[in-house]
């Protein structure tokens, strides 16, 4: 019997907080000679797995005696020679055929041909944690990627893509960012915190304990697919110059707020805070329009974001760690702020409104500052103590299959800094020209797409919401002032 590729190892508690699904996207590469280029990623994949064999692994229930119920592990493939890299030839299709979003009627099926696995993994047998599909088109290459999200987070995805590209370059690719030793060391740091949960934090809201996944998962899938028929997916872009100008306006209002100064705070917001808040603000404006008396808005609105903790601990997690080094930021803001009724039982909103009025700014700008500052303040609480408390809480969960996401109105994943466009595949391929995400299936799911190289920078956002809400969002005067409902190709240099 041959020696396994690697020894099986258990997932961390943070890995178990992620629902079972694949993160999927594809990268496009216009190339003059497809026949030559198609061999490059195939050879690169073999080199890649030889150096990092755990990426050929499968996710399955842990079989070690005495482990907690629900504990999952990564184990080597049961059979040798199962390819991580698949190849498909599309002799009658070009890159342009793949670039249009399929929107509601086709439920993203236009993209499925270029992706290696479906969105939902099977739960009754071991499933691969990483797959790539090489699609040979008439005028280029499409690389379809799939990563099991219970094993790999967005930062890890970017690292894997860059290292995969290095292996595609062959001997000249240079050293990898991922090392087997750092993976083991980082998992150990995330597995043990050295103390009880901090009583200041209520982790039940972020990670409530529910019943294990029901046996009728197929029924759940069908419900989600039917619901997806009512959704619309759209790409938007915001020029970075407009983001920077609006951020400076908001930070100026914060610096000029006497009340915030009196509290001894030195408030500021980042570009990411601002983009998330602008989307959050405009979505609630169009979901609960003032002229529609038939829609009664809730008392508040909530958002959930994943926060990279690699640099937030006193003993930092290695930046090349590819597992889930994320905790959830969950923040709620009173609906009065979104509907420009600042001051209704909201002292912070009243402060922002008074400062904006004194500076001659618009009411929606005051609301934006109020919302962005709430996000920034919550982000500032996610430090070493908070992360260790989360880890300790998860260590005490009796059955890891019961850990779930708390409910929120919007889920936003920022891939802005994962570095996908920095990946250089060399040879006949070079850098990717575009990244595409399949149409979304869930109302209120958004991705801030990776930063591009070039002289015309912008923020790209992949938005999935109800069809009627999408129409109103596109027409919203604030959103339209900063965005264009165009494909992200407009953000790159022509």
UniProtKB/Swiss-Prot annotation:
Pathway: Secondary metabolite biosynthesis
Record-linked Pfam families: Transferase (PF02458)
Molecular function per GO: acyltransferase activity, transferring groups other than amino-acyl groups
EC number assigned by the record: 2.3.1.-
Keyword terms: Acyltransferase, Transferase
Domain of life from the UniProt record: Eukaryota
UniProt keyword Transferase present: yes
Oligomer status and interactors: Monomer.
Known function: O-acetyltransferase; part of the gene cluster that mediates the biosynthesis of the indole diterpenes penitrems. The geranylgeranyl diphosphate (GGPP) synthase penG catalyzes the first step in penitrem biosynthesis via conversion of farnesyl pyrophosphate and isopentyl pyrophosphate into geranylgeranyl pyrophosphate (GGPP). Condensation of indole-3-glycerol phosphate with GGPP by the prenyl transferase penC then forms 3-geranylgeranylindole (3-GGI).
Membership in a protein family: Belongs to the fumigaclavine B O-acetyltransferase family.
Name of this chain's protein: O-acetyltransferase PC-16
Gene encoding the protein: PC-16
